[in-house]
Every structure is written in structure tokens, then in C-alpha cells.
Amino acid sequence: MSDFLRDVIKNAGNEYASIVDDGVEAGDVDSFIDTGSYIFNALLSGSVNGGLPSNKITAIAGESATGKTYFLMGIVKNFLDADPDAGVIYFESESAITRNMVVDRGIDPKRMVIFPVTTVQEFRTQAIRVIDDYMAQNEIDRKPLFLCLDSLGMLSTTKEVEDTTDGKETRDMTRAQVLKAAFRVLTLKLGRAKVPMVVTNHTYESMGLFSTKEMGGGSGLKYAASSIIYLSKKKEKDGTEVIGNIIHCKNHKSRLTKENKMVDVRLTYDKGLDRYYGLLELAEKYEVFKKVSTRYELPDGSKQFGKAILNDPETYFTEDIMHKLDLAAETEFKYGAGSEETIQDSDD
């Protein structure tokens, strides 16, 4: 049967086809991209050491002014910091990104390319061309690449632009279909190229007796994205000064981890994503750290206030503690998780 199946693949002419035991070329996730936040990594992948799937589309959605762009730029910074040869293609539809903004966020401007796009068709054509050019390189010459679209909600269509130019006020009813077609093609190409993409989008409250938060743009991105994260925020203050935001991240949809889980991450104006924020709550829930009155009891028996731990995280989140938290994250976020190695016994 094995020989027959290989003949079927050969004769079918489908370059993506493979026997599952050999790996599913465009489907298997063989690596993850660190987002710069351990708890956000866990929400997306079930591991504090994971993050964005390296060959999938991830959507980050929220209402206006929830920090979607700054959140995405924090991920971009961490991606570029992790590999000096990495590059970012940033499709931008809001005319909101400036060179100073990129430099102020600590992002290397020499390795980030901005593609201004107005329509879905422009984005689709240029994104596919980028991926095709990337795949045309010898595999050994391909450096890590990250694609971003900020934002989907601001993209028009060719028809809408033409109608506006002609003074017509008719609504373009084809936009959802054009988007769906674009993401159908991109999903497979990104999977094969092993290139991640993050798309920001807006949300709105649906009409009805029980209103729910919905993502704009039709069903195209909803079906194409492996994860959809809804963002909301509250201001982070140091005394009376606003120094950033606490971003509430809800896993609205995921093919890799449990849906409807929520975590908080901290995004500061000067440092971007806080790598350790959110781990304290996970440590408390799984008794890696035990809450005793207003302090936390550490495995060595010492007690510290939560603020002291967060102010010096590298001292307290040791390699052993991070291993226990990784086990906790697997249990908390992964489907059917239940590691044979228990969290309490991981240091035996």
C-alpha cells in the first residue's frame, strides 16, 4: 500500500501532498516564534517557550485604541532581536507607522520593510509575490521572515476605490469574497514557506438580544487564522503617570490551545512587552509559588511580595521554576494536556 500511495502522490501532481508519517508539509507546526511575553506564548502554544506558530496566520483583534499596533510592534522587535538575519515585511494600511516610531520601539529599521497598501487586491498580490520570491531562494539561503498586516479593517477594494472616484455611493458587496479568496491562497503558501503572519483587525458589538464581540471583514480571516486573540486594555500607572497598558488577551479561536482562555500582558511605552508579566498568577494557581497572606512563599521557603518578584524577575523565575511553569502552561492551555511529569515532582 505504501508504494501505491507514493505513486498516487507522484501522479496527482500536487506539490503539497505527502504521506502523513513523513510530515504534513503545509500543516505541521515544527517551531514557534517567541512573542516576547512568556504568558502570551503559553496562550498561543501551550508552552512558555513557544509562541506564534511559525507557518500559520494569527489574528489580533480589538476595538480602536486597544494597542493592536504597539502590541504587534512588540512582537516584531522580539522577532528581530532573536536573529540578526531575520527580516519583517509590514503591510500597512493606516499610514500610522513612522520611522521615529519604529526606532523609538527599539526595532532595527534596516531589517523592516513597510509596504503601504490600500486595497485587499494590492495586499494579496504583493504578499503572494513576497512569499513566492522567498520560496524561489535555495532553502539553505532562506532567513527567518515574518509578515504583518496592520490592519485588515482599513483595506478597501479596487471596486470601492473606483466607485468613490466616480462619485458612486453604492456599497461594495464583494469585499468579503475577495478577502476569503486572498486568505485561501495565503494560508497554504505561508504553511509551505514556514513563514508566520500576524493580522490586526477591528472588532464590533453584534446586534441582537445578547450582543457579542465580532471581528470585521467577513469569514475569510476567521477560517484562515489558526488563532484569533481579542484584546482589551486598562492603563498601567506608576503613581499618577501612565506608563503603558495592561492588555487583556482572550483566546477567541485556536487550533492549538484551549479557546476562551484569558491572560494579561503588560505593554509599556519605553520597553514594549514585559516578558515575565502574568507568570505570577500562573505560579500561584499551580502552587509553584504559594500565596501566604500578602506575600508569596517560594520553593526555598523564603517569602516575597509580588511587586518585588516582578521588579527582579530573573532572580526568582529560575530555570527550575520556568520548567515547572512550562508544565503548568501545558495543563492550563493545551487540549487534553496532562503531562506524565507532575508540576510538584518536576525537581525530583
Q: What is each residue range found by the language model?
A:
Residues S2-R111, I128-D132:
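The Walker A/P-loop phosphate-binding site
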Residues E25, E63, G74-I75, F79-A181, ...:
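Conserved inter-motif catalytic segment of the P-loop NTP-binding fold
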Residues R6, K10, Y38, A42, ...:
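Solvent-exposed alpha-helical segments within well-ordered globular domains of core cellular machineries
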Residues T58-I60, I89-F91, V113-F115, V198, ...:
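Hydrophobic/aromatic beta-strand patches that form the interior of the parallel beta-sheet core
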